[in-house]
Amino acid sequence: MLNNTPLILSFILLIAFSCSKTEPIGKPNTPTLNIDFVKTLGGSLNERGESIINTNDEGYAILGYAQSNDGDLINKPDNSFDYWLLKFDKNHNLEWQRTYGGSDDDRGAHFIQTNDNGYALIGYSKSNDRDLTENNGANDFWVCKLNVSGDILWKKSFGFLGADNGNAIIQTQDNGFLITGVLDVSASNGQGNSKATGTKRHAGGDYWAIKLSNSGEKQWSKFFGGTFTDTPFDVIQTKDKGYILIGSSDSEDVDIQDNKGSYDFWVINISETGMLLWEKSFGGSQIDEAHAICDSGDGNYLIVGDTRSNDFDVSSNNGAADLWLIKMSPEGDLIWEQNYGGVSFDAGRSISKTQDGNFLISGSSRSLDGDLSENKGQNDAWLLKINPEGTLLWHKTIGGSNIDFAYDAIELNDKSIITIGESSSNDGDISTNKGFSDLLIIKTK
């Protein structure tokens, strides 16, 4: 009879070493992600990049706001805040820049390239001079339609006596626009719906959706929320011509039926004409805020933001706040959720699909443990790539010893990545600071 003992022992040892716990499990095999350049643009005061898009000529454009009227700013008449739009070619050369606004506080939040190769911008304005022809009181939604060269074709203000802030714009299937942001319902005394809707009592800030024609004429408007603070940050049109709006809510009444505690991700689905079809709250007992939504490519949606919870819908939390990602069905059912971060404050601000079918997330991090292995000091810009199942493929922190944030990121045609935000650093990855805070542009590949 053959003695098989040595063979059996060898097989057992092979299995043991193959399953060694010294190998990291669940950590991404981080590839070398090279920083091609880091640029800061601005003047002696405060600048910030909020939104970036690919343009039809293979370049890109950035919208934010600027306070300075020196340094990199051109033809800006004073040091009030204005919308700041910058257009770059495919070789990263600045082709042109424009500021839009008046003599008060005007800040760009989001923009798109339109079907006619122009641009549509949204944010808020407190001005009633220069580029502004009206102000209804405090902050108004301010929408600007531009041609391909950045000239204003039309502009519209929407609001009442309170702080009404525009946060997102999309071009709709009928070639018009849907804009959303916060309506101060208390200050508007219940105004803001294009039709009377009964006796339900709203208060505080509500989601406000306004449908515009291609020429900027209001077709309808509707607000949604409760009696506390409800803030939308993003919107997407559905296949049936309705809309999904996402943001945060700490209300637990009127339109909100299932608040988990404090602020939740609050998602609403409205019809083509603004009728509320359903609403869902996702989160835990602490503060959870959704900031961006994208189509997952399989008929569902991915929503990113941050969470301070570790109960109810949030299965785990690494620390003070984690970047939180959920996958949701078209009916508003939670499919899965995933958190990323360390023991400090980590947040997600944008999500977009990449050419290889994965997803790019931008945000910020103060951690140097958990999913993070590096922190340059205070807040760093944080860039992550995940697969469709939410597995972290790689991530990169970029910053200096002061406060640096990423608010948006896109993949270019050559698969390089441009991330934008703001920076107060002048060391580490960021060599120059022009003023208090600068518009930050990072190219990685």
Per-region residue spans from a language model:
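A sequence-level/structural motif corresponding to short, flexible coil/turn segments enriched
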Residues: 20-445
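Bacterial Sec-dependent N-terminal signal peptides
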Residues: 1-32
